[in-house]
């Protein structure tokens, strides 16, 4: 099993969720996060004063999948989240040793 963590622009969340559902993903977790990458921050003007915004709002999606579903999920995320502009986000894939469904005690791919 693998865990996919995708950091995306918030307005792309619905499109990414639908794209993942289309490739068979049955569940995911979403967390609102702030961060910066190469794009750094930006300046905003508010009531005549200029402010530097260092951390930009993003959304982190977490999905745990069987190994044979990972490539399709990654392609779905990229296809739905890509705007061809700086700040589109990143995808991280890491191994998951074990998953257990609390209610039933099922483990592995059944969890």
Predicted features and spans:
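Positively charged, small/polar-rich N-terminal and surface patches that mediate targeting and assembly
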Residues: 1-111
């Amino acid at each position: 099993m693998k865990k996919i963590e995708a950091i995306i622009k918030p307005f792309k969340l619905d499109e990414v969720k639908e794209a993942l559902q289309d490739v068979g993903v049955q569940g995911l977790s979403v967390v609102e996060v702030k961060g910066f990458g190469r794009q750094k921050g930006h300046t905003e003007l508010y009531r005549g004063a200029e402010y530097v915004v260092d951390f930009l709002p993003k959304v982190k999606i977490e999905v745990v999948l069987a190994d044979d579903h990972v490539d399709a999920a990654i392609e779905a995320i990229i296809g739905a989240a890509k705007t061809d502009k700086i700040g589109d986000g990143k995808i991280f894939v890491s191994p998951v040793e074990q998953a257990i469904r609390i209610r039933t005690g099922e483990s592995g791919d059944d969890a």
